[in-house]
Amino acid sequence: MMKRMLMTSLSLILALGLAACGNGSGNGGNAAEGTGDAATGSSGSGDKIKISYWTGDRHDADFVKEKVAEFNETNTDGIEVELVVKGDDFDTALDLSFQTSDAPDVIRVKENTIQTFYKKGFLAPIDEFLTDELKAKFPAMPDLNEFDGKRYSLPNYGTTMRLVYNKDLFAKAGIEHPPTTLQELVDTAKKLTEAGKADGAYGFAQNFKSPGSALGRSARVIAEMSGYGGFGYDFKTARYDFSGFEPIINAFKQIKDDGSMLPGVESLDIDPLRAQFAEGKIGMYMSFSSEPGVYKNQFPAKIDWAAAPVPTIDGNVKGASGFLGGQWLGLSSKSENKEAAWKFMQFMYEDQVLTDYQEKGFGISMVPSVSAVAKTPDVNGIEGFLPNKYDGVWPVYPTVAPEGMKSDDAFFKYMLNGGDLKAVIADLNKRYNAALDSAIANDGVKAEPDASFDPASLGGKFAK
């Protein structure tokens, strides 16, 4: 399957724990917890089979520590797991461990690291351990937990994307429901601004200090729901084509030109945006399922708010809102105790563990059988982020490094300065496809057209 790089970003599991979870790239905020945190038990007899599990996650460290201790105390195979919680140095430490004899037995993998770890040879396939029941229970996701027909991890939780809106400001403006089209988005932002401007409230904002982050949680998901690849890649033709973004970027520009966008978005980062929203100064923005935890803990909301599906270009859903995730634990290729390591992994993937994981608010399950029985976490606003029939996992697109300005920067420049958007898009298509051709010729990147690709078929796998 063609490759596409999934954005990592904050997710519910980050925010609900009041800390960013990081396997290095894209998820900062962790500090190393010494050299490790061993949870030991006294089960079994004779010499222990000692294995280690390395993770960069801090948000769920206490939960995982409890489960490690439970496994150590209850397993009858004499296996003892040491939990090692790293911080921002996770990737570097893992690289160094594979150059020595200190590599872990089990590795925390994410959508933004599993491909790299696979290519570096850090991971061992787990197919020999998978029963037919496990294969049916845990979805296979090519390029996310499956490579060249072999499984390297199983899913646990995922991240959804939604429109976050200020219900109080909506009521003040007399607006009954969130926008479902781009034109409604523009009109709603204008009405919200008219109702709130006297109090310093504006209809719309995104964290445009980083155009990639801002558009990656807004324009991207609007495009995906409308049937276009969220990063400009067309899976049917195996070429880059940003033309689907034209109405989206024009709508954002119109909101700014109307004066409906919070002043100063050019320098607005995500946390200052959240702080403003919590105070009631923003009517709408788009983001990940991290937001409920943020407004419970980091920036307690002083307003009534909710989340809804993002609008599409014309009100018709022709694709799927990206559901990010698909992996959790990986088996180290250097482990000398792979069977013991798998028994620990199998324990962590038991229904009760995964159900507890969601119900305690660490993440939204991507395992259908768990989603069907797990209770909704007691966190205000989370219900709007739970999987719906329009959430789906997009294939991975090929990573390229175009010369010149990246697409997000080019789009934001147009939003600020105007110009010819069609010409901007034509230039992006030319440069991105040149970079793609170079990557195919020189770097072994694969990009094959799939004329039968149907973005609408991606949804409906996690909820009906």
Protein language model regions, located:
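Extracytoplasmic "Venus flytrap"/periplasmic binding protein-like
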Residues: 70, 74-139, 146, 168-180, ...
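Long, aromatic- and glycine/proline-rich binding clefts that accommodate carbohydrate-like moieties
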Residues: 144-145, 301, 305-310, 359-415, ...
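Glycine-centered hinge/linker elements that transmit conformational signals in sensory
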Residues: 189-190, 235-265, 310-313
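Mature extracytoplasmic/periplasmic domains
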Residues: 62-63, 123, 290-296, 327-402, ...
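Extracytoplasmic/periplasmic substrate-recognition and gating elements
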Residues: 73-74, 149, 173, 258-260, ...
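Conserved N-terminal structural module of periplasmic/extracytoplasmic solute-binding proteins
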Residues: 7, 22-114, 177, 340, ...
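Extracytoplasmic/periplasmic solute-binding protein
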Residues: 148, 152-156, 161, 186-238, ...
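Hinge/lid segment of periplasmic solute-binding proteins
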Residues: 110-161, 196-197, 202, 215-217, ...
